[in-house]
UniProtKB/Swiss-Prot annotation:
FMN binds at residues 123-125, 233-234, 273, 288-292, 314. Its EC number is 4.2.3.5. Pathway: Metabolic intermediate biosynthesis; chorismate biosynthesis; chorismate from D-erythrose 4-phosphate and phosphoenolpyruvate: step 7/7. Its cofactor is FMNH2. This is Chorismate synthase. Belongs to the chorismate synthase family. Keywords: Amino-acid biosynthesis, Aromatic amino acid biosynthesis, FAD, Flavoprotein, FMN, Lyase, NADP. The gene is aroC. The keyword Lyase applies. NADP(+) binds at residue 46. Homotetramer.
Length: 354
């Protein structure tokens, strides 16, 4: 499927080495002021080729809005946009025409579809996530109307951990580090110099989300957020609130007691029973090391024969860095979708509207 969301949907298209990538946002309310400078600034945060901690593929990532915006305001029509691919080097992948890259989706996509684009992964390339970032930027323009903010940063790189998360630092950091930035940078560069890669974890928080978002059973807020984050290239695990640590606690430690003023703690991470509590929503995404590494590796070719190959091309030494920007975008899309879905959740809401 190429469409995400229920009430607010984002459909993406394009491949890594195709002419362009792009998206269509449907269900976006009319009357929202569209900030194209903010849109571009978000794309720039994810854009490749900006520094030595990302792939050297240098794309401008300029989004051209084709429809859905009139005189700077959303019109209620589908918002379509396109981002041209301008720095492909398809020859770097010619040696992969008959070979499955270890750790990539080459093998599984070929088994499913019987055909695959060997040039940088084609449709399944992380290049597509630029469209998600653009979609998330539009979602944030709507969230701004309600005082909702979403922030993400790199919490750890391998075994180097940030300590107390500092989102102000992350906003200024080349690698969006939440702390211990120099050690994280050093480890990323060490991996790159050794023709290897390294994993990372990303912390995301949502502030200002209203109480009551999410459906109680089959479209729970935490389940949809987890699915949105797991759908990002390279994410292997997602935690909400205490996450895995909750399995090590007693109920008396994990429960969030309440007073007249509200919750006394937030072990739940802002979600109970699949519905938002009004507290800060807290999520962690765990990214595997970039599977594209420049070491000799054994794999299979299309005939099922064992072969050895060495990768060429341009690749991120740590996908969690730019992945943190994508995580923010996906969370924005989910929160917007849930807010729009919630409008018809009870009679009082309907009477306010009609």
């Amino acid at each position: 499927m190429n469409t995400f969301g229920r009430k607010l949907t984002l459909t993406t298209f394009g491949e890594s080495h195709g002419a362009a990538i792009g998206g269509v946002i449907d269900g976006f309310p009319a009357g929202v002021r569209i900030d194209t400078q903010f849109l571009q600034s978000e794309l720039d945060r994810r854009r490749p080729g900006r520094n030595k901690f990302a792939t050297a593929r240098d794309e401008a990532d300029r989004a051209e809005i084709l429809s859905g915006v009139f005189e700077g305001v959303s019109s209620g029509a589908p918002i379509a946009f396109v981002i041209l691919n301008q720095n492909q080097k398809s020859n770097d992948y010619e040696n992969l025409r008959e070979i499955f890259r270890p750790g990539h989706a080459d093998f599984t996509y070929f088994k499913k579809f019987g055909i695959r684009d060997h040039r940088g992964g084609g449709r399944v390339s992380a290049r597509e996530t630029a469209v998600r970032v653009a979609g998330g930027a539009f979602a944030q323009m709507l969230l701004n109307e309600f005082g909702v903010s979403v922030k993400s940063g790199v919490l750890s790189v391998a075994d180097v951990v940030a300590g107390e998360p500092d989102f102000d630092l992350a906003s200024k950091s080349e690698i969006y580090s939440l702390g211990n930035e120099d050690a994280m940078k050093s480890l990323i560069m060490k991996a790159r110099e050794q023709h290897d890669s390294v994993g990372a974890s990303v912390l995301s928080v949502v502030d200002g989300a209203p109480t009551g978002l999410g459906e109680g059973l089959y479209y729970k807020l935490d389940a949809v957020l987890a699915a949105a984050l797991m759908g990002i290239n390279g994410v292997k695990a997602v935690e909400i609130g205490e996450g895995v640590n909750a399995s090590r606690l007693f109920g008396s430690q994990n429960n969030d007691e309440m007073s007249e003023q509200g919750f006394l703690s937030n072990h739940a991470g802002g979600i109970l029973g699949g519905i938002s509590t009004g507290e800060r929503i807290v999520l962690k995404s765990h990214f595997k090391p970039t599977p594209s590494i420049f070491k000799a590796q054994k794999t299979q070719n299309l005939k099922g024969e064992c072969v050895e190959f060495e990768l060429r091309g341009r690749h991120d030494p740590c996908i969690g860095v730019r992945g943190s920007v994508v995580a923010t975008a996906m969370i924005r899309l989910v929160i917007c979708d849930m807010m729009l879905l919630n409008l018809g959740s009870n009679l009082a809401n309907l009477k306010k509207f009609y």
